[in-house]
Each structure stands twice: as C-alpha cells, then as structure tokens.
Amino acid sequence: MDFSRIDLSPEDQAFYQETRAFIAEHVTDDVLRRDREFGENFDEQVHLALGKAGYLASDWKLESEGGFSPVRRRIFQLEIGRAHTPWYHWGTTSVVARLMQQFGEPELTDAVLPGVLSGEIRLCLGYTEPEGGSDVATCKTRAVRDGDTWIINGSKMFTSNAQNAKYVFLLTNTEPQGPKHKNLTMFLVPLDSPGIEIQGIRTLDGDRTNIVYYSDVRVDDLYRIGDVNGGWTVMRSALDSEHGIVDPDDHGLQNISAMSEHGRVMAEAVDKAAAWVTLQDPDGRRPLDDDSVKYRLGRSIARMEAAVSTPGMYGRVALAQTMRDVSSDLMDILGAASVLPTDTKDSAGDGAAEYLFRHALPTGIYGGTMEVFRNMIAEHALKLGRPDYPG
C-alpha cells in the first residue's frame, strides 16, 4: 500500500476549502449541542442543506454516474466526520437506495430516489426483532399476500432514525414453514401507513433508537424489493457492506476498517486524556509524573493505533474491544472527574472518556455482536468451520 501524501490538484484544493466552509456554516455549536442532548445522530436542516448543495447526490453516485472522484469522496467524508456532523443515518439511506435501484421496480425508484438525493426522504432498517438477537434470519414479522397488496404484522427493535424517515427497509417472513433464509421477503414500507406505531427508546450511550410495531399494515406489491422469498439475496450485499467483508477499492482511499468512525471518537478521548495528564495540581504535580500513568496511557495509544489500522471485519472486532478496554483505562487515569459528562463543570477532558465508556458497549453490538464477528472470522477467513455450541 502506498502511504505517500496525496497532492491535491487546484480543483480538489478548492473543493476542500469549499467543503470546510460549508460544514462550518451549517454544523454549528447549536447543532452539535442538540445532537448530544437528543442523541438522534440527525439534523434535518443540515441534511437538507447537504442535499441542496449536491453533496448527497455526489456521495451516493458512482464516479461513472457523475459522483465524487475517490479523492473528493475521501475529502468529503473525512471533513464530515471531523466536524461530528450528525448524519450517521445517511449511510443507511444510501445503501437501501442502492438496493432499491438494483432489486426494486423502476416505478418505485423513480418515485423515491429524487427525494433521497435532495435530503427530503430518509430510509431506515427494520431487521432485528425482540427475540431474534443478531440472527435476523429468525424473522417472525409476517407478510401475507392479499391480491395486489400485503398485510404485515409484527415488531422490530433498534429501528434507528425511524422518527425521521419516510420508509423502512423491512425484513418479513412470507413462508413460515419454508426453509431458513428462503422464506424472507423485503419491502420498502411507508412509515406513515396506518397500523404503524413508532416508540422511542434511549440507549446507554445516549442515542435514540426505536421499537416499531406493525398491526395489519397494508402495503402495495410495488413496494416489494426483490423476489418473494428472495429477501436474503437482497439483504446479503447490505450485510456484507455493514460487516466489512466486501473487497476494498484499489485506490486505497476508503476507510481501513468497518465502523472506523468510532475510532475517531476513541482517538479524541485519548488525545484529551493526554492533554489532561500534563496539567499541574495546586502542589505543582502532574498525573503524567506517575510512571503507571505513563505506561497505561502509552498502552492505550498503542492499542488505539493498532485497532484503527486493522482492516475490514477484523478491525470491527479490534475497534469495539479496544474501545471497551481503553475507556476503562482512561477513566482510571483521569480519576473521579472522569465520570462527569460533556458540558459539565470540572469534567476531565470535557467528558470524552465518560462518553467513550458508554459508547463502547453498544459499539460491540451494532450490526452484530463481537461474538458473531469472531465466528465469521473463524468460519470464513480462517476456514475453521461453523461453531459447535453445546446443548
């Protein structure tokens, strides 16, 4: 891999400056404060501004379709991340829109895609069920055909951003007696349909997600994505992308690991801790003068660097595990003030370690638990076969 610095062309340099100015104008302190308070990872005005300026369309489209070049895509994504822009759910919308275009009816794509690219239409995922855990193929939400429509009943957990979305990419069971993975069908269900109830819940890290209930929800067959009982085929590409097991592009400008944006959160917490331990107390002593602090901070930095440099699904496990381990070390180093959250008087490092500690636990669950990913690595990468669970 070539690690040399990329020299930007005058045009790309201008794009870099324009993007930074745009983000500075729209991602204000008030936007970030609201995001911390409500945990939605979404701001409608910012999202609409990104759409109006053409950023969403350029990010979604391939370069051959008029989208960003690899260099501009990297510039855009890095600057969006560095500013803590609350747009995490754009990734979900982008992936679902691509699947809709690939597997859905052209009429549906023509109706939905323009709104996606303008920012007016957002999409969310309806996979996980209350009793299903990480195995989405155990789906019990039923879709029963009734002429040209389908009647849907069931419930889904962790449907993040449903409160801001127009449609949910919903996994249903259309043949309960059929073989696993061959009885699933996908729909793009309008969330304003009668019979849908969205109930917000707050997670440990302060984010909002949702339980969504479906009671005799009628959906036209137009909204079916892919073949009847062919839902697993539709889902596979989305899951592979989420899990980080797709082949990387050869330009080398994409994120190294899956969920690498969480590595940035860890890096900022480590940087703030490193600055805090250099401060003197009233007696002129610094935490950094303690050899154990030097050792533990140095170890945290080394582990963080290793985790963010680990590729693909391996990095997904490395990041989640390292966040859990490093956050505990940082809170020990910073002492009692480390339990005070961001924007609290006298918090250590502005609460970055406290947030990392809370954020680390669900990070090991998003998109599948660490145990699921370790099994995937063992089975698919190391060729060790399927796990054999006792009992």
PLM features: what roles do these ranges have?
Residues M1-G91, A111, G115, K272, ...:
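Amphipathic, small/basic residue-rich leader segments at the start of a protein or domain
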Residues D2-R5, V71, I75-F76, V95, ...:
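Glycine-rich phosphate/cofactor-binding loops in nucleotide/flavin-utilizing enzymes
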Residues T141-V144:
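A structural signal for short hydrophobic beta-strand segments in well-ordered beta-sheet cores
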Residues S4-L8, E197-A307, T363:
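Glycine-rich beta->alpha junctions and the first turn(s) of the following alpha-helix
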Residues V31-E37, P282, K294, G298-S347:
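C-terminal helix-coil-helix/basic helical segment that borders enzyme active sites and/or dimer interfaces
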Residues D148, N153-Q199:
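A short core secondary-structure module
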Residues G119-Y127:
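A short, Trp-centered hydrophobic/proline-enriched beta-strand micro-motif
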Residues G51-G119, S160-Y167, M304, V308-G315, ...:
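Internal helix-loop-helix
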